[in-house]
Amino acid sequence: MKLQKPKGTQDILPGEAAKWQYLENVARETFKKYHYGEIRTPMFEHYEVISRSVGDTTDIVTKEMYDFHDKGDRHITLRPEGTAPVVRSFVENKLFAPEVQKPVKLYYIGSMFRYERPQAGRLREFHQIGVECFGSANPASDVETIAMASHLFETLGIKDMTLHLNSLGNPSSRAAYRQALIDYLTPMREQLSKDSQRRLDENPLRVLDSKEVEDKVAVENAPSILDYLDEESKAHFEAVQEMLTTLNIPFVIDTNMVRGLDYYNHTIFEFMAKVEGSDLTICAGGRYDGLVSYFDGPETPGFGFGLGLERLLLILEKQGITLPIEEPMDVYLAVLGEAANSKALALVQAIRKQGFTAERDYLGRKIKAQFKSADSFNAKTIITLGESEVETGKVIIKNNQTREEMEVSLEEITSNFATIMEKLV
């Protein structure tokens, strides 16, 4: 057997990892402005944590989950999404307690796992950034969270974005619409795809977001959920639209958008980005006021979203957005001869401890090859250290752009390298 990474996974090498780190840091800094704190949950959960919350009939549970029985015969699943584990943690750690300041605002960054056909921007191990806000039923919380996502994408420079918005209403509105949709679709059952015929029995709202051509034709004149919202649900959705307008965040109402998870109610949304003529979902989420009680916690409103890092990187690449990740090295130390080996190590370490980035040669190469390395690292300065420099205690440091040179003592470098850099760079 050839030892390679499993299908649907990837190795993220240093040059690429720098892009990931940049995106993660921008997300962290953005979320911090909104008073969100990071939460880290296990990569695997008890099967029921996901099946109970996401929905037994969803594609995630029926087709896509990586689940197994461990050596203690516990039914375990690798997490396929981030919200359910965070809600489980919220309840288990009693973050609903009165002494905990509300709303509780949490974000996570980590790996998720789904068994599906690998394609660009969608792998079997994928990485997700998500946020969850617990404790506020105020439509302003919906809008703030959507605005935070918009803020993040604006910071990254993403272009041609559209916010798609819909409401699933409260449970009674949703139940009334569910029945209306069943009544509408049942006469044309045989015209639906096999998956949607199953969905019609289990979760008819999912037929609305099917990508199959025959299903799209069938739902073209389907009743709109907005016609089945009760007064409470209408008021909530109208308030969300009004506040988005106040914040100058444009949106379109998309009544066929239902989201793939069963726990949503009231506001749901997706941000779409135009890429090579196609609309790609960049981020999606919504309100889930009943989910905490599914985990035997008290009735607690919630709102959140998730976005895939692979998908985000793909969109940035396709839109020609270059991330500012290339940071030049402060100094490269060229080493000549065995006599300078130990001193070079001490010198480069002293430079690093003063807060500068530094590298040295470890391969005993000729000076020309070492200078090429300095260029490839985009080093600002080069120090050459050989036997004579060790004996005299002095070296030449050169600005690698202007070629200006300075003679400095090794003592100056180890005690006050910042002053040298100020003079030379």
UniProtKB/Swiss-Prot annotation:
Cellular component GO terms held in the UniProt record: cytoplasm
Keyword terms: Aminoacyl-tRNA synthetase, ATP-binding, Cytoplasm, Ligase, Nucleotide-binding, Protein biosynthesis
Reaction catalysed by this enzyme: tRNA(His) + L-histidine + ATP = L-histidyl-tRNA(His) + AMP + diphosphate + H(+)
GO term, biological process aspect, one: histidyl-tRNA aminoacylation
Aminoacyl-tRNA synthetase keyword on record: yes
Any one Gene Ontology molecular-function term assigned to this protein's record: histidine-tRNA ligase activity
CDD domains per the UniProt record, alphabetical: HisRS-like_core, HisRS_anticodon
A Pfam family this chain is assigned to: HGTP_anticodon
Enzyme Commission code(s) on record: 6.1.1.21
Origin superkingdom: Bacteria
Places the protein is found: Cytoplasm
PANTHER family the record matches: HISTIDINE--TRNA LIGASE, MITOCHONDRIAL-RELATED, HISTIDYL-TRNA SYNTHETASE
Record-stated family: Belongs to the class-II aminoacyl-tRNA synthetase family.
Binding partners and assembly: Homodimer.
HAMAP family per the UniProt record, alphabetical: His_tRNA_synth
Descriptive protein name: Histidine--tRNA ligase
